[in-house]
Amino acid sequence: MSEIFSPAQRYELWLRIELIVTEGWAEIGEIPRPAVERLKRARVDAEHIARLEERVGHDVVAFLDSLAESLGDDARFLHRGLTSSDVLDTALALQLVQAADILLNDVDRLSAVVRRRAIEERATLMAGRTHGIHAEPVSFGFILAGWLDELDRERQRIVTAREDVRVGKLSGAVGTHATVDPRVEEMALAKLGLRVAPVTTQVIARDHHAAYLTTLAVVGGSLEKFATDIRHLQRTEVAEVREPFGQEQKGSSAMPHKRNPILSERICGLARTVRGYAQVALEDQALWHERDISHSSAERIIFPDACTLLDYMLRLMADIIEGLTIDRERMRANLYRSGGVVFSQRVLLALVQKGMSRQDAYRVVQSAALTALDDGQDFRTIVGEAPEVRERLTTEELAELFDPAYYLRHLDVTFERVGLEPVALAPSPARGAAQGGGS
């Protein structure tokens, strides 16, 4: 990713654009074909261009001056009818397309890891939590299936952003083609693999770029969501999962026992940075008239940084999930830590099915559940002693309501919907043994 946005690569793209434009001029008979062939001998010298830029204060002028020193009279055919932004914006489009391709590969790798772990943990029971409070049983594989579904959407968003930003312009100083034949633009951009922006000013409208960076921010938000879940599940009081932690790694300069979720925390911090860059891109939409240069300085930072950061975040998240320790015994123990109140809705629905009004059934079940929570008692015992329950449910019927497998009975459907094999997989004994015991 860093190579895409390196000065040397940027100059190579500029040269490629300039040469392809001369080919377009030659096609319509405006430039001698032999001169075009001689121009192809041009080579960029990034260090020399940088020195020239310090003197002239303009990057494209420095680039052209550097080429002119070695090309002689043929250099006059370069940049014919173009303005700097023709080269800059077209090159930026190529860079962002290349960056999107890398990000798509990153998403594919992460999705493959999540897919495999979801299948492995399909039947790993744990407490589902809403508002941070125990709700109903889920499986860790179910949670990972949700992540996979989200990654599928993020992939499509990147594909859409890539196509949206895949536009170039070679239309001159204010976009009117006064000095560039539209045929040259069409031929050149076709060779570059870019679409022609139908209407431009001196620049391509920045809604394309704002949408691109906003997409990166949304993808980063998904990674932050995954990382936040991991951080919560690694808390000492929960201890259901654990990030990879090296044998010689240290968690604190003061406390030797510390094993902190720093990788997930890092992703959360970097997601905020990418969101900040998206805000800058949104601000860059409102340029003066046919163009000002207020966007330029910001874009030199936000595009390389945001693309590089998201590339790193996607790779890091894949490594985290690949090496994530899952404590299945702790997950099951935590599920029952709240005294079995996670089964309260099943009791409620069973009573309603037996003829109680929903309001009365809710009152009975809630009273038993809150007593169990407040006094640290077993919910099934307390609710089973309620007269309204004894009158309607046998001991066997009540026991069936506390079967956690009930909550996973439609998991095959969920897995099929995200393209996962609907096969009931028991947790791997080898993996479970290696990963047993929370921190």
Which functions belong to the PLM regions below?
Residues 97-108, 115, 145-148, 152, ...:
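Short amphipathic alpha-helical segments with heptad-repeat character
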Residues 142, 210-218, 346-354:
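Short, well-ordered beta-strand elements within core beta-sheets of diverse protein domains
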Residues 185-278:
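Acidic, glycine-rich loop-and-beta core segments that form the ion-binding/anion-interacting portion
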